[in-house]
Every structure is written in structure tokens, then in C-alpha cells.
Design a protein with these regions (language model features):
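Extended, charge-rich, solvent-exposed interface segments
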Residues: 212-214
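OB-fold ssDNA-binding interfaces and closely related basic DNA-contact patches used
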Residues: 1-118, 187-188, 192-210
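Extended serine/threonine-enriched, polar tracts that run as long, contiguous segments within proteins
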Residues: 96-210
Length: 214
């Protein structure tokens, strides 16, 4: 799961302040997690409920697949779920919010098997990108994947073979973590509207070249 951080939690530090990735304690064994840089952390939700788990500001993932859906919360029952292409139906049922699930392998935790990153709102947009904004996955495709495709074409031409090989996202590690400024401090952005405005930290690609040529 993605934690947005909170500028008001600077004194507390860690995930509460700077944001990052959180994994519940029962999802993997402690020895494997701590050996790969994960730190014990407690996530206290707005409701007051808390979860024990582990935190890491940045991870590297191999992206296998992505799925998205609309959810409508209910005060009287479970959430209603709608396919991504059925936004109008979701909106008619109530306040629709998107949820993105990204099936990945996490570098260092490959022995655990595939895991699912759960993202909503600004975090999902920052990870995947949108019509008017480039996300971590978009930048990954424009740089690492594009460079790999070009290298494959060049090698194929040299060998007199057919070109056009397209590398999938899962072929390379995508480093993605909490946004930081040049001083290494959390980079908060403003999201929401009117009274619902808040400042959060979103996931960004880490250490990618500016262009495929680099």
C-alpha cells in the first residue's frame, strides 16, 4: 500500500512524515523484509485503527499486470465495485473513486512471489500517469523500455534479422518511491479542492535517465 505522508508529522519522521510503501506484517516474514531494508512501522488510519507492518521509502518492481476499477462506499453495506469502463454506472450509485492494483515482483522479495501494489487517487495517477501527466510507468516506458527496444532493433539489423521486438515492462526493474527534493526532504504536492485540499507525497520514478538516449 502507498502512504501519502503528512507534513504535520515532521517530528515523528519515518513513514508518517515522508510517505512510502507499507506492507502488512502478515504478508511476509520479518527476516526477509528487514534483510532488504524494510523497517518496522505502524500505520494509524484516520479512523484511529492501526496496522503493524513494514515500511520502505522506495522499492524496485517488475510490473507484470495492472487492473483498475471504480468503488462506491456505502454506510449500510460493503463497497460496490464497477469495471473501469463503467464510470457512469458507478457515479450513479454514489461517490465513485478509482483503485489501481499493480501485480509486481519486488526486488529482494522475489522468493515471496508476486505481490500487489494498491494505489488510489493521486498515488495511482502518479504511478501510472494519465492523459495530461506523465507517471513513473510512463517515464519508464519512454526511457528504459524505449532504449531496450532501440537496442534490440539495432542488434537485429546488424544480424540481418527482423526488427520490431517490444520489451514488456516486466523485463526490467522500475525503481519507484516517495518524491524527494534536491535536499532529500519529502516533496509535498497539493491535491484536492476547496476544503478537501491536502498536501501529500506521491510515488515517482527514481534514478531514471531524462531521455532514452541517456
Amino acid at each position: 500500500q502507498w502512504h501519502y505522508g503528512d507534513a504535520k508529522a515532521k517530528r515523528a519522521g519515518g513513514m508518517a512524515y515522508a510517505g512510502g510503501w507499507f506492507i502488512k506484517a502478515d504478508m511476509a516474514d520479518e527476516a526477509t523484509l528487514t534483510a532488504n531494508g524494510w523497517v518496522k512501522e505502524e500505520w494509524t488510519h484516520d479512523s484511529g485503527a492501526s496496522e503493524e507492518g513494514f515500511y520502505k521509502p522506495a522499492i524496485a518492481v517488475s510490473v507484470i499486470a495492472i487492473r483498475k476499477r471504480w468503488e462506491v462506499a456505502s454506510d449500510t453495506g460493503p463497497r460496490q465495485l464497477f469495471p473501469w469502463g463503467k464510470y457512469d454506472a458507478a457515479k450513479a450509485a454514489g461517490k465513485a473513486s478509482g483503485r489501481t492494483h499493480v501485480l509486481v515482483l519486488v526486488k529482494g522479495l522475489e522468493s515471496i512471489g508476486p505481490m500487489v501494489l494498491t494505489l488510489k487517487g493521486s498515488a495511482a495517477m502518479s504511478f501510472e500517469g494519465g492523459r495530461n501527466s506523465a507517471g513513473a510507468l510512463t517515464k519508464f516506458g519512454q526511457t528504459v523500455i524505449t532504449a531496450a527496444n532501440r537496442a534490440s532493433d539495432a542488434a537485429a539489423k546488424k544480424a540481418g534479422q527482423a526488427t520490431g521486438k517490444k520489451w514488456p515492462y516486466r523485463a526490467f526493474w522500475l525503481p519507484v518511491g516517495a518524491a524527494r527534493n534536491s535536499a532529500g526532504e519529502p516533496e509535498f504536492i497539493e491535491v484536492g479542492k476547496d476544503k478537501a485540499t491536502k498536501r501529500v507525497v506521491v510515488p515517482v520514478a527514481v534514478g531514471l535517465p531524462d531521455k532514452a538516449e541517456n
